[in-house]
């Protein structure tokens, strides 16, 4: 890739990673222009320091899973959090026009990052933070046909998203593979 960049075939080289230690090594290597890493309002202090490290090394930071793979249901919280890190470019994972409209409105009228917002974020952190599945699907395909991201997050999906689809006969058959 470095050779292709020198020849002008590509302009930038980026890396995507889910492991903080590997991501830190990539930043410190000086070989990459961007880092794509899971980052949202439930990110811990280590993830925030990683984002700051990219800023300090003049490296782009792309926040994947800005809504934690759909587990953060209040877009305002993560939007307000992201605005505290203006060098971070989030990938929101918008799937519907209504979601696009919500983010366009948030961009026009950003919510305050106040004590109320911080309390909502802290509630999400207590429920979701830690080593949990972000739903990226990097673990797929499973040789046994198990939908690993759904299985790993099922208890959260049932509580934090419209649950009816998860209770179908088809989904029950999928979960019986586990």
List PLM regions with ranges.
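Glycine/proline-rich, positively charged
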Residues: 1-62, 67-70
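Structured C-terminal cap/extension of enzyme domains
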Residues: 49-178
